Amino acid sequence: MTEQEEKVSFGITIPKSLKTRLKIYCAQNDKKIQDVIREALEEYLQRREK
């Protein structure tokens, strides 16, 4: 994804405990939730698209 690429909203449902872990991680690492999720999806797909 490039910085100029159009962004769209993407809603999902996740377990409450996972959301809590994500929020804690983001707070401790000064990251935005949307950035962590985007990075995780990019990494996940890169590993499986080979």
From Swiss-Prot:
Pfam family, one: 56B_RHH
Alphabetized InterPro entries for the sequence: 56B_RHH, Arc_rbn_hlx_hlx, Ribbon_hlx_hlx
Disulfide-bond pairs as recorded: none
Source organism superkingdom: Viruses
Classification via Gene3D superfamilies: Met repressor-like
Biological process annotations from GO: regulation of DNA-templated transcription
SUPFAM superfamilies in alphabetical order: Ribbon-helix-helix (SSF47598)
Protein name: Uncharacterized protein 13
Organism, as annotated: Sulfolobus islandicus filamentous virus (isolate Iceland/Hveragerdi) (SIFV)
Source taxonomy: Viruses, Adnaviria, Zilligvirae, Taleaviricota, Tokiviricetes
